[in-house]
């Protein structure tokens, strides 16, 4: 039988080149995600196993589905065995459904982590996450079985053998609801609930959260190291008021700033075991420990080990850049015109737990935001296809979209498999650092 190809030679070459790049990029990007989660110390959380499974599903789409879809698109007919057509259709539904059910499970995980933080985080073990992932794949497998069991009547085609999923209206609507619309509704409702919880928590403000460093100053007790157990942080002021040398006139000796008493009641008390560190210079206040090193995960520090240079901060005393006051590893410096406020690693067990908990909550918020972006992009990519697919089943005579537009929506859905690594790179600094470390290591090994 003479088959007429649907595209010209130039269009066929262009489409083949673009889709081949899509396949390679999808495999490379998602393999990088899996490698980053399994090898990086900054991505050890059990919930990241969801991302490993999701990346595996995207790799399977790129290797087992997209190449055959490309051949079917360019040839205009199904070139391969009939049995493989049935397996191909079932796998297509399986991987697409597993992706969205993964996102649905991730949404529920986010909700439980936000609404029942202490209770759920104690139960969120790798074993529990793996059981949830297995359940996700079983649900997707159940939804993908009908193409193997009931093939429907596809009828002859003038363009040769075709490989299409069941075209009956009941199956189209049932599969669209089960594979896309129902999970989407669950995700939207869950994330709406997460947003309301976060908004209510934000309204409460820091007073309701409590923790070290809040409340009135308590009597200092000596710590095991001999330093006072609590220290006061001087309130930050404007450059003019803080130096007492506005307009070039020094403040008279013994004159206090407005609102400042000898006991400095406005100063915040630091948690126990945070010792004060002296700075050089007569008139400078003591530098005090401000925050533990665990919080450095909240800041994006692209370069490490930078040394303090006097030229970089004109107007500051040179003593503040002396070797004795350089920032220790794992600490940060807040430099003001009053002096230098330096933090260190020495925190007590209770305070360390509080700060670790705060850092964990910050990462949870960032992770929730990144996954909201992932879900939003997934819905944007697949909604046009499922909407037009269902619309054709509801009113096939008057609502059917042109074939070219439908195929465009079909391929936009496949493109989603390559986007998650890009989203992680843009919105998550932990993944960004892990990707850079892996790629730089491979580049170094290749160079040598």
UniProtKB/Swiss-Prot annotation:
InterPro entries: ADR_fam, ADRA2B_rcpt, GPCR_Rhodpsn, GPCR_Rhodpsn_7TM. The chain crosses the membrane at residues 13-38, 50-75, 86-108, 131-153, 169-192, 371-394, 404-427. The keyword Nucleotide-binding does not apply. The record marks 175, 179 as: Implicated in catechol agonist binding. Pfam families: 7tm_1 (PF00001). Residues 203-326 are annotated as: Disordered. Residues 1-12, 76-85, 154-168, 395-403 are extracellular. Belongs to the G-protein coupled receptor 1 family. Adrenergic receptor subfamily. ADRA2B sub-subfamily. GO terms for cellular component: plasma membrane. The keyword Transmembrane applies. Interacts with RAB26. Interacts with PPP1R9B. It is found in: Cell membrane. GO terms for biological process: platelet activation; regulation of smooth muscle contraction; regulation of vasoconstriction. A lipid is attached at residue 440 (S-palmitoyl cysteine). Disulfide bonds join 85-163. One of its GO terms (molecular function) is alpha2-adrenergic receptor activity. Keywords: Cell membrane, Disulfide bond, G-protein coupled receptor, Lipoprotein, Membrane, Palmitate, Receptor, Transducer, Transmembrane, Transmembrane helix. It is a multi-pass membrane protein. PANTHER family: ADRENERGIC RECEPTOR-RELATED G-PROTEIN COUPLED RECEPTOR, ALPHA-2B ADRENERGIC RECEPTOR. Alpha-2 adrenergic receptors mediate the catecholamine-induced inhibition of adenylate cyclase through the action of G proteins. Signal peptide: none annotated. This is Alpha-2B adrenergic receptor. The record marks 92 as: Implicated in ligand binding. Residues 293-309 have a biased composition (Acidic residues). Residues 39-49, 109-130, 193-370, 428-448 are cytoplasmic. It comes from the Eukaryota.
């Amino acid at each position: 039988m003479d088959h007429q190809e649907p595209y010209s030679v130039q269009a066929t070459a262009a489409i083949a080149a673009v889709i081949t790049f899509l396949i390679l990029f999808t495999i490379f990007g998602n393999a990088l995600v899996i490698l980053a989660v399994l090898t990086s110390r900054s991505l050890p959380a059990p919930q990241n196993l969801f991302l490993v499974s999701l990346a595996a599903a995207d790799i399977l789409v790129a290797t087992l589905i997209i190449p055959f879809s490309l051949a079917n698109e360019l040839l205009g007919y199904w070139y391969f065995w009939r049995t493989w057509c049935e397996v191909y259709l079932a796998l297509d539904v399986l991987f697409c459904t597993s992706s969205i059910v993964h996102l649905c499970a991730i949404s529920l995980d986010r909700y439980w982590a936000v609404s029942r933080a202490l209770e759920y985080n104690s139960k969120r073990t790798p074993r529990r996450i793996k059981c949830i992932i297995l359940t996700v794949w079983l649900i997707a497998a159940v939804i993908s079985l009908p193409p193997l069991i009931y093939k429907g009547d596809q009828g002859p085609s003038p363009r040769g053998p075709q490989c299409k999923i069941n075209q009956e209206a009941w199956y189209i609507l049932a599969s669209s609801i089960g594979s896309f619309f129902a999970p989407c509704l669950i995700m939207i409702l869950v994330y709406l609930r997460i947003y309301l919880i976060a908004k209510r928590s934000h309204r409460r403000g820091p007073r309701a959260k409590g923790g070290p460093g809040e409340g009135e100053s308590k009597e200092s007790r000596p710590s095991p190291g001999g330093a006072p157990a609590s220290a006061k942080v001087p309130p930050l002021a404007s450059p003019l008021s803080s130096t007492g040398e506005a307009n070039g006139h020094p403040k008279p000796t013994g004159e206090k700033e407005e609102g400042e008493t000898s006991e400095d009641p406005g100063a915040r008390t630091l948690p126990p075991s945070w010792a004060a560190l002296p700075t050089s210079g007569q008139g400078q206040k003591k530098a005090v420990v401000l925050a533990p090193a665990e919080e450095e995960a909240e800041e994006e520090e692209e370069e490490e080990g930078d040394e303090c240079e006097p030229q970089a901060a004109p107007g500051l005393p040179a003593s503040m850049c002396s070797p004795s006051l350089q920032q220790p590893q794992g600490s940060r410096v807040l430099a003001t015109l009053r002096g230098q406020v330096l933090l260190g690693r020495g925190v007590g067990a209770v305070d360390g737990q509080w700060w670790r908990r705060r850092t964990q909550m910050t990462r949870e918020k960032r992770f929730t935001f990144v996954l909201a972006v992932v879900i939003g992009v997934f819905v944007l990519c697949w909604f046009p296809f499922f909407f037009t697919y269902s619309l054709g089943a509801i009113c096939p005579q008057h609502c059917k979209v042109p074939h070219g537009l439908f195929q465009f929506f079909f391929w936009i859905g496949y493109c989603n498999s390559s986007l998650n690594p890009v989203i992680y790179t843009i919105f998550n600094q932990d993944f960004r650092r892990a990707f850079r470390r892996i790629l730089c290591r491979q580049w170094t090994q290749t160079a040598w």
